[in-house]
Amino acid sequence: MRIQEMDMREMGMSGKEQERTGKPSEAFYRVEKQLTIQLIPQKGNERLLAEVPHIRWLDLAMVFRIYREEEGCSLSLLIGREQLSDWNVTVEEVARKAMEHMPRLLPVKLCGVTEELERTAKGMGLTPPKSPEPEDGLKLYLLTNQRGYNGAAAILYEGVLEKFAEEVGKDLILLPSSVHEVLLLPDGGDSDYEALSALVQAVNETQVRREEWLSDHVYRYLKEEDRIIAAGNGTEGNGVKGGVWG
C-alpha cells in the first residue's frame, strides 16, 4: 500500500472550530484514534525538533503523526505546534492518546528474521534461502508493525518487549534497523555491544536511506527492570522505563 507523507504545518490545517475552553476541541476528538508516534534521532533533526511538538526519549525523539487509510492509499500527516494549540492539548496528552490507540491502528508484528525472509521469497515466487541456525542458539527477530511503516515505535507498545523477553528468558539487544523496524537479539550475556553498534553504523551507511536512519548504536532491554538503556559507543547507562516516554 502506498503511503503519502504530508506536513500539516505546510497545509494550513487547523482545528479552530470552537472557542477555547479547558477541554480539548472537537477536532482533537475526531483525530485522537488516528494519532501515531514516529521515533527519529535527535542528532540531525535539530531544525525539525525546534518546530514540531516532540518528547525526547534517550537519544531519540518522538514526533507525532495522524495516520489514515483512504481508498487504497495511506496518509501520514506530521503534527505541528499549531495543531496542539488549536486542539487545546499538550504534547503529553497527544503522546498518551497515541500510545493508547496506536497498537490497534498499527498492530505489532514480531517474527523471526529467517521466517520473514522465507515468506517474502515465497511471495515473490522465489526459492526461500536456507539459513543455518546460529551456533549459540540465539535467533534474530524482526519487530515492526503490520504496515512496516514507522514500525520502530513498536518498542514503545505496552508489554511487547516485556512479554517477549519473558518468552526467551533473556534480556534483549535492540538493533535499530531503521525508523521502520528494529531487530531483536536475545542477550546471551557475553555480547559485544561496541561491535554490534559498529555493525549498525555500517548497515546505516550502506543499506539505509539517510532519512530513515534511527540510531548508530544498539540498545538493551533489561527484563528484570523493564527498562531500555543505550549501549555501545560509550552510551551505556542512561535508560528509561520500557513502554513509557521519558
Residue ranges and their predicted role:
Residues 1, 34, 39-51:
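N-terminal accessory interaction module
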Residues 3, 8, 172, 193, ...:
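Intrinsically disordered, low-complexity regions
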Residues 1-35:
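An N-terminal, globular interaction/scaffold subdomain
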Residues 178-246:
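Alpha-helical oligomerization segments
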Residues 11-14, 122, 136, 150, ...:
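Feature targets compositionally biased, intrinsically disordered low-complexity regions
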Residues 1, 141-143, 230:
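Generic recognition of long tandem-repeat/solenoid scaffolds
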Residues 46-207:
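A contiguous, surface-oriented mixed alpha/beta subdomain in the mid-to-C-terminal portion of proteins
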